[in-house]
């Protein structure tokens, strides 16, 4: 048996798609355990770029079963489109397994998400307005609608009509918007019933049986650790637990079944939307990283904020997730920079902080303390061995590894599937 969790060690967009694709090539199951279509990753296959937001990356491999587990929230309209896109590329989607206990994103969730975000004005969270937060809120309030509900017309209609009553009070009384119509939602979701009936499986049992049969399982996280609802830069976080502990909870397996926890980080750091960002570069360095790194959101197309790699937050991610190793992506983006900085501490009120601060206000006021390295000019995209990297690049990687006290076992030096260094 081999079970591996792959997750982001930053604010998402770390290049997890390429890493999960690397693992998926030998996996029997690839399991999404949280989130919805609010995060995306792009997998480059030759000249083709395949952008996935909800379907696990294992769908690209004929011998792998992609699983959307109970910790996820599902926009069935979006899923239908994504499956159609894959089918048009002659990719088999019949093997997709969907948990009956995953919650459904309803049209009113997306409407509420947009209205709530707009009402925050300058204090906007930066949500993708996909309905993720309101869907998880309904789940916690025990009024959510699950995948299995769609298989029973009477149950589904009853739950929709019950939820609509409260939702319409919010829409009409608070936001002064017209009410939504239950019958229209019911009719829309009748068109999605085939998706559910064709793919619904007891995914917890499916994973358990795979473990008993010593199969290889990959648990694929979305977003990143610093967006975790409990451990991230609250309130500028997502609505689910993105850290490693949720791989077990969101999939319906026990934590003792997890063998390996891989964190993914870029050689620098980026963030989408609002929230504190201590090493952000609002200058030509930031512009350089954005342009060379193609730092624009897969889902939203938004320009990402970029900055130097923050080892304090990275070491925090190591702790929160019990990372067994670290994968670094986009090292090639740093090629061409004369000097490169690594954040090794925070300065706050004349005090040097070397542990990640729990106090929210510190993240807005702290200043980064940098260690500066000489850069390199060589094109490293064809490099296959660590020893063949420029000496300055080797020093940069070794410094990161020594600071976080976790081995770096994989370095991506280009966007292609094969442009990697395995250590």
Model-derived features with residue positions:
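Non-transmembrane, aqueous-exposed alpha-helical and coiled segments at domain scale
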Residues: 1-423
């Amino acid at each position: 048996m081999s079970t591996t969790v792959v997750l982001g060690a930053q604010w998402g967009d770390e290049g997890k798609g390429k890493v999960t694709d690397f693992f998926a090539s030998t996996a029997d199951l690839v399991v999404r355990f949280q989130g919805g279509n609010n995060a995306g990753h792009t997998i480059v296959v030759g000249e083709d770029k395949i952008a996935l937001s909800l379907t696990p990356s294992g769908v690209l491999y004929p011998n792998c079963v992609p699983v959307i587990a109970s910790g996820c929230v599902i926009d069935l309209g979006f899923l239908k489109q994504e499956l159609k896109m894959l089918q048009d590329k002659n990719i088999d989607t019949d093997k997709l397994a969907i948990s009956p206990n995953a919650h459904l994103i309803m049209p009113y969730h997306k409407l509420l998400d947009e209205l709530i975000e707009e009402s925050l004005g300058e204090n906007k969270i930066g949500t993708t307005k996909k309905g993720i937060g309101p869907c998880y809120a309904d789940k916690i309030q025990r009024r959510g609608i699950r995948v299995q509900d769609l298989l029973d017309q009477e149950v589904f209609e009853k739950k929709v009509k019950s939820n609509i009553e409260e939702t319409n009070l919010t829409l009409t009384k608070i936001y002064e918007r017209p009410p939504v119509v239950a019958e229209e939602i019911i009719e829309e979701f009748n068109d999605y019933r085939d998706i559910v009936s064709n793919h619904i499986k007891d995914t917890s049992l499916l994973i358990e049986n795979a473990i008993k049969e010593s199969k290889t399982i990959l648990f694929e996280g979305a977003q990143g650790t610093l967006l975790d609802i409990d451990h991230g830069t609250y309130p500028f976080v997502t609505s689910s637990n993105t850290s490693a502990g949720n791989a077990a909870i969101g999939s319906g397996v026990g934590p003792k079944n997890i063998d390996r926890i891989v964190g993914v980080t870029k050689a620098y750091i980026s963030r989408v939307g609002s929230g504190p960002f201590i090493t952000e570069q609002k200058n030509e360095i930031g512009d350089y990283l954005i342009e060379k790194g193609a730092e624009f959101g897969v889902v939203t197309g938004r320009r990402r904020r970029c900055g130097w790699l923050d080892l304090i937050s990275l070491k925090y991610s190591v702790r929160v997730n019990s990372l067994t190793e670290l994968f670094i992506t986009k090292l090639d983006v740093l090629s061409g920079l004369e000097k490169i900085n690594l954040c090794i501490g925070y300065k706050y009120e004349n005090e040097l902080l070397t542990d990640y601060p729990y106090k929210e206000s510190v993240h807005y006021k702290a200043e980064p303390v940098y260690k500066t390295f000489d850069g390199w000019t060589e094109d490293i995209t064809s490099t296959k061995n660590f020893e063949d990297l420029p000496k300055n690049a080797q020093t940069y990687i070794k410094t990161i590894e020594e600071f976080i006290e976790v081995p770096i076992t994989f370095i991506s030096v280009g966007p292609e599937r094969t442009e990697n260094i395995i250590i």
